[in-house]
Each structure stands twice: as structure tokens, then as C-alpha cells.
Amino acid sequence: MKLPKPWWAGGGLLQLTILLSLVGLRVDLDLFLPPPAAALWEELLPLCPTRPASASNPFSASEGWERTPLLPAKGRLLHEVRALGVPFIPRTRVDAWLVHSVATGNADGAHGLLGTAASSAVGDGGQSASAGGGDPRAAHSSPLAAEEEEEKAAEPTAQVPDAGGCGSQENGMLREKSEAVDHSSQQEENEEGVSAQAKSRQQSKTEEHKMACASAREAEKITEARNESHLHWSDTSFSLEDLFQLLSSQPEHSLEGISVEDIPPFLSSVCESVNSSAQNINLSQAISHDVNLHEAMLLYPNNTFRRDPSARSSQAQEPFLQLNPHTNPEQATPAMSLPPFDNQMRNLTSQDLLYDLDSNIFDGINLMSLATGFSPLEVSQLFEEPDSGLSLNSSYNSTSLTNSYRIYDGTVGYNSDLQSLCHDLGAVGGCYPEPHKHCHMDHRTIAGFHVSLECQQVFHDHTYHLQSGASEPTSESFAWSEKSQKTSGCLDNPDRNLSRDEQRAKALHIPFSVDEIVRMPVDSFNSMLSRYYLTDLQVSLIRDIRRRGKNKVAAQNCRKRKLDIILNLEDDICNLQAKKEALKNEQTQCSKAIDIMRQKLHGLHQDVFNRLRDDQGRPVNPSQYALQYSHDGTVLIVPKELISSGHKKEAPKGKRERRN
């Protein structure tokens, strides 16, 4: 089992001081107090079931609180938290919450249980503080201790010896209640269908319960011994309910002078009481370490021991000032994680005080009302520090969001040509200006930008002093805002986008649109003019609009026909060029084929003349003779002289016939 750390180790006292400062209670922490004595550390170590041999006092004899390396950073965090100022929390709301925090049926039992637990815890704490060498001036320097001594002076002191019996009764009741809580949590897990995990958790719970019972018995023996030996702190014992009532009855700034030196006896006793009596409570299912103020104010009894991890991660991303920046408690550093005392204290108080609360009470208690209900004037009155140039406008109306968005639209690349775009829109026959490239933002991006601005405006009152890099709005941003306002006004005004004919028709209250006047057939147009009682000016304007519209349509049709003819002519030219190329290719192929035929014919002539012989058996000379083909298919060998003379005689005859 893991060795439980004392509540003051690891900066637990400093974290408690920071938590009280966030609530509004100012506590002066002296970081140069002497460290706890070794005797007190030796008395606290037997509370652990298994004490390792290496366990020792975390504070050396020569070094004090100032020697701890983690305290300077947390000291700076405490000063930053105090610099935020005291938040305004209505006291009437807190008092009503405390009055109605316990149901009527279980009020006596719950208050009695808390009273006995606090009384026994205070008694134990006083004895441990005296045994450990605590500061004796803590009992007299605190105004709370003085008031408690005055109240306890009138009460009998015979109740002190019964502190051990009350502690044993408290341990029994806490065991029964923790067993009931564990049983209910096991039933919920069985309903969810995780049977394997439920069995493993049940086994671990039984082992922890056995170990917790053994440690509780040892704690009871220690508390009985301390009650018998040390009784001087019993006069200052008081219950948690009395403490809460006392804190609520004090003025707003009356508790700022209380130092931490007055608190250690009571807090140490409460720590020991909780460690001794609530060991069997399953701390793995308790409130996780990443606790913020929003979750603490909106804590319901149903989800005290269980929290949805998705909801926890979503809430951790909200711009609240959280105590722990890590969303996963396993990955949190030991320096920033809250000690086990803080978890057990919240577990005990939430289990006893918030278990029987009606859920309707928590519906009216919402931390968001502190941000949404304030006006800028009230916020400026509550916080005395300047706002460092940032706007405290926390309203949710669209005007503020639009104005805040206009300040930043110059940084995303908007062009001032949108203003000229509105004025350059022509009438029916007008032309549109040259298109420009404008920056376009998606609607989802703009919506997300609005949401982020809205969150910063609402929740920045506690964190605006940390934003040192945020510069004040310059004159350039205001110039961009003016340009964007003109552009948005130009786009939002419907009269600017109308044509000249539409504006004239609207001015004369003509009951027809320009499109109907232009596109309507002639018969319908004439019947329309006869049905309505129109003035001469309206009729002339309607006819002018129709004439200009028809001329515009005719011109558009003419341009369309010209474009069609040009496009068709271009297509025809392309087709003719393709056909010409095809014919050229075909001619080339034909000339190649003719050349091949001539070569073959010449080879055939050579072959024939090589085979021919005259009457004397000599070969025929192809240069003197030629082959002549007749119509019947016969082939004759004729001298070339006769063929050439016959061609010459036929040529003059042909010329004569042409002349005749």
C-alpha cells in the first residue's frame, strides 16, 4: 500500500491557503515557520499499515519551509491569486445554501455526526500539535480561538473524556456509510455490464477494507492515549457546522488578518480524524485531483464519486483558473497534485452534507451567474485594478460580438474593394466591375471566432492581468473597423444592390417587378395595363422599362448569335484543315503506289524481251522494239519507229478536228 503523505508535506498547506484565497478568505502564510518536529512525524507514521524502512522525516533538522524547492513557485502563485482581488460572492446565497444543505429528515443525524467528528478531531489535533513541538502562541493569537474560548467557557467541561467513545462511534458509522456507498457503486457497475472490472474492484475493496480496519484500530488506541495525556486543546474544539456558521457570520474583510499559525492545531486534528476514520472509503473513486471552482460549486450528490471523463476533459478546457492544469490525475506532477488529506476532506464533507440535498437546489446555484449577471459598470466597481486595455463587455448580444469581430477583420486579409463593388453595380444595361480576389472566411470559422471572443469577454476578469503580451488597440485597428463597417453596411443595405430601373419602380410604387414587365408576353402586358389603374408617369416608366429590357434581351440574343456563328466558323475551319491533311496523306500514298507499279512494269518488260528471239534466234533489242497490246488481248512486237511515226500523224488530225 502506498505510504500516505502528511497534509503539510508537498506544499499542502500552501495549496489550502491558495484555495481559501480563491474563496475569499485571506490567510497570511508564514513560509519561514520551523518544520514539524520529528516526534510528531514518528507518531504519524504508525497510522500506515505497512511502514517502509526508508520512510523518514521529509524535513531535515537544519532546513525549514524555506528550503523546499517547490515553495517559491507556489509562493508566487499565492501572490498572483491574491492580486486578482476578492470575488464578489453574495452572502445571502451562501447562507441559504448552508441552511438548506441537509434534508429535514436527516438533519439531526448529519449534524450530530459532523459535530462528533470535528470535536474528536480537534482534540486529537491539539494533542499532536503539543507533542510535536507546535507554536503555543497559536492558541491565543487567533480571533477565532478567542471567540471559541468565550463560547466554550459557559459550557460544561465534562464532555471531554468522552472524545474517545465519540471517535469509535464515528468510525463505526463511517464504516457502515462507506460500505453502503461501495455497495451502491458496485450495483451501478453491474447495471453497466462491466462484470469483470466489478469483480476485480470488489476484491481490491475488500483488501483495502481489511487494511483500513487494522489501521483504524491502531488510530483509536493512539487517540485514546492522546486524549488522556493532552487536554489543554479541548477547550477550542468545535464542529465543522460551527466553523461554517462562524465564517459566514464574519464580515467580508474581517478574516484577512488571520495567520496560518492559528489554524494548525485544528487542521492537524481534522487530518488525523479523517485519516483514522475514513480509511475504508474508496479514494480511487473520489473526486479527482483536477478540481476547479466551477466543479466545486456545481457538485451534485449523484456524481460525487463518479465523473464522466469526457465531461471532465471538456470542462478542463474552459478558460477558468484551475488549481491543477493536468486533466489526467495520473500524469499530474506531485508538486501540483493535492494531498490525500484534501481529497478525504472533500469526500467526507460532500458525502455527509451533500448526499441528501435536493437537485433542485443546485439548479439555482450556478457560478456562471457571477459572469453573465454583471454589467460592465458593476464589474468596474467591484475590481479596483485597471483592465489593462481589455474590454470588460460581458453581454451576449450580437452587437458587441459584431463590433469585436470588426476590430479583428483587418488582420485576416479583408480588401477595401468591397466598398467600390457596391457602388459600381450598374442598372439594367450597366456592366459589372472587374472581379477582385477577396478573402473568404467560412461561416463555421466565423462562428468559432465569435464563440472564442465571447468566452474571453465573459471569463477574462480573473486572468486579464496575466496577458502581458496583449497590446492595446491601435489606430490602425480602428481604421480597419471603419472600413469593415462601411463594407458590411453596403452589403446589408438592399437598396444599394438594386438597379436603376428597380429603384425608380420602387419609388413610384409600381405593383410589378422589373422581370415581370420585361418577360411578360404582349397580350398579358396589355391586359395588365388595362386591369390596374396607373398614372401616366407609371405607364411611361413601365413602357421604358419594357423597351430597355427588350433591347437588352435583343442585344444579348444578337451577341449570342454572333458568338455562335464565330464558334461554328471556327469549327468549320478546323474540320476543313483536318480534311486537307487527310487528302494530302492519301495523295502521297497514291503516288507511292503508282511508282511501285511502274517499277514492276519495267521489270516485266525486261523479262519479256530477255525471253524473245527473232527468226535467226538472236535476242530482241528492247531499245528498238516495243510491245503493243491490242483489245483482244494479243501482244505484238512492233519497231519503235513505226509507233513514233503513227503518233506524229495522229497529232495533226486531232488539232484539225479541234479547229473544225
From Swiss-Prot:
Predominant location category: nucleus
**Positions of the region Disordered?**
120-214
Subunit-level organization: Heterodimer with MAFG, MAFK and other small MAF proteins that binds to the MAF recognition elements (MARE).
List the expressing tissues.
Answer: High level expression in brain, thymus, testis and placenta. Medium level expression in uterus, stomach and lung. Low level expression in kidney. No expression in heart, liver, spleen and ovary.
Compositionally biased intervals (Gly residues): 123-135
Q: Does the keyword section mention Electron transport?
A: no
The record's PROSITE patterns line, in alphabetical order, gives:
BZIP, BZIP_BASIC
- UniProt keywords, alphabetically: Activator, DNA-binding, Nucleus, Transcription, Transcription regulation
Q: State the similarity comment.
A: Belongs to the bZIP family. CNC subfamily.
What does the protein in this record do? Activates erythroid-specific, globin gene expression.
Region Leucine-zipper: which residues? 566-573
| Keyword match Transcription | yes
Q: What is this protein called?
A: Nuclear factor erythroid 2-related factor 3
